[in-house]
Amino acid sequence: MVPKLFTSQICLLPLLGLLSAEGSPHARPQQYSRAQWFSIQHIQTAPLHCTSAMRAINKYQSRCKNKNTFLHTTFADVVNVCGNTNMTCPHNASLNNCHHSGVQVPLTYCNLTGPQTISNCVYSSTQANKFYVVACENRDPRDPPQYPVVPVHLDTII
């Protein structure tokens, strides 16, 4: 009985390795800091249709991301939100590094509607003006030195 249990545990190890090698569906490309990846995924000063805008994100992940929100503002403006009062992150109560925007910004919400093959992801676009909540962290050496604290995660749209 014991050898069988031991063998079954050993058999799970390669599977666990495959799962971790695959990575999270939201894993950032290693060449980017968390703030740089935040900017690629969520900052778009001028609205583009989602099908076009999502190509840049999908090419890094080699898959069609199910949904995404683009804030039509500047990275510097979102950095300024990091200076607002800390709050518990609405979508992750264990984190206390979130900040409410305090002002509404124009944004585009993209939702995957078409084929899920990387060569032809199709999205619907919904435009709105909303508040947002971002998680912020101390900058990575790859981030602009003028920003000691930078946004790394778009937690909620309100």
Swiss-Prot record:
<dbReference type="InterPro" id="IPR001427">
    <property type="entry name" value="RNaseA"/>
</dbReference>
<protein>
    <recommendedName>
        <fullName>Non-secretory ribonuclease</fullName>
        <ecNumber>4.6.1.18</ecNumber>
    </recommendedName>
</protein>
<dbReference type="GO" id="GO:0002227">
    <property type="term" value="P:innate immune response in mucosa"/>
</dbReference>
<keyword id="KW-0458">Lysosome</keyword>
<keyword id="KW-0456">Lyase</keyword>
<comment type="subunit">
    <text>Interacts with and forms a tight 1:1 complex with RNH1. Dimerization of two such complexes may occur.</text>
</comment>
<dbReference type="GO" id="GO:0005764">
    <property type="term" value="C:lysosome"/>
</dbReference>
<dbReference type="GO" id="GO:0006935">
    <property type="term" value="P:chemotaxis"/>
</dbReference>
<dbReference type="GO" id="GO:0051607">
    <property type="term" value="P:defense response to virus"/>
</dbReference>
<feature type="modified residue" description="3'-nitrotyrosine">
    <location>
        <position position="60"/>
    </location>
</feature>
<feature type="glycosylation site" description="N-linked (GlcNAc...) asparagine">
    <location>
        <position position="111"/>
    </location>
</feature>
<keyword id="KW-0325">Glycoprotein</keyword>
<keyword id="KW-0540">Nuclease</keyword>
<dbReference type="GO" id="GO:0016829">
    <property type="term" value="F:lyase activity"/>
</dbReference>
<feature type="active site" description="Proton donor">
    <location>
        <position position="153"/>
    </location>
</feature>
<feature type="signal peptide">
    <location>
        <begin position="1"/>
        <end position="27"/>
    </location>
</feature>
<dbReference type="GO" id="GO:0003676">
    <property type="term" value="F:nucleic acid binding"/>
</dbReference>
<keyword id="KW-0255">Endonuclease</keyword>
<comment type="function">
    <text>This is a non-secretory ribonuclease. It is a pyrimidine specific nuclease with a slight preference for U. Cytotoxin and helminthotoxin. Possesses a wide variety of biological activities.</text>
</comment>
<comment type="similarity">
    <text>Belongs to the pancreatic ribonuclease family.</text>
</comment>
<keyword id="KW-0732">Signal</keyword>
<dbReference type="InterPro" id="IPR036816">
    <property type="entry name" value="RNaseA-like_dom_sf"/>
</dbReference>
<dbReference type="InterPro" id="IPR023412">
    <property type="entry name" value="RNaseA_domain"/>
</dbReference>
<dbReference type="GO" id="GO:0005615">
    <property type="term" value="C:extracellular space"/>
</dbReference>
<dbReference type="Pfam" id="PF00074">
    <property type="entry name" value="RnaseA"/>
</dbReference>
<dbReference type="GO" id="GO:0004522">
    <property type="term" value="F:ribonuclease A activity"/>
</dbReference>
<dbReference type="InterPro" id="IPR023411">
    <property type="entry name" value="RNaseA_AS"/>
</dbReference>
<feature type="binding site">
    <location>
        <begin position="65"/>
        <end position="69"/>
    </location>
    <ligand>
        <name>substrate</name>
    </ligand>
</feature>
<keyword id="KW-0944">Nitration</keyword>
<keyword id="KW-0378">Hydrolase</keyword>
<feature type="glycosylation site" description="N-linked (GlcNAc...) asparagine">
    <location>
        <position position="92"/>
    </location>
</feature>
<feature type="glycosylation site" description="N-linked (GlcNAc...) asparagine">
    <location>
        <position position="86"/>
    </location>
</feature>
<feature type="active site" description="Proton acceptor">
    <location>
        <position position="42"/>
    </location>
</feature>
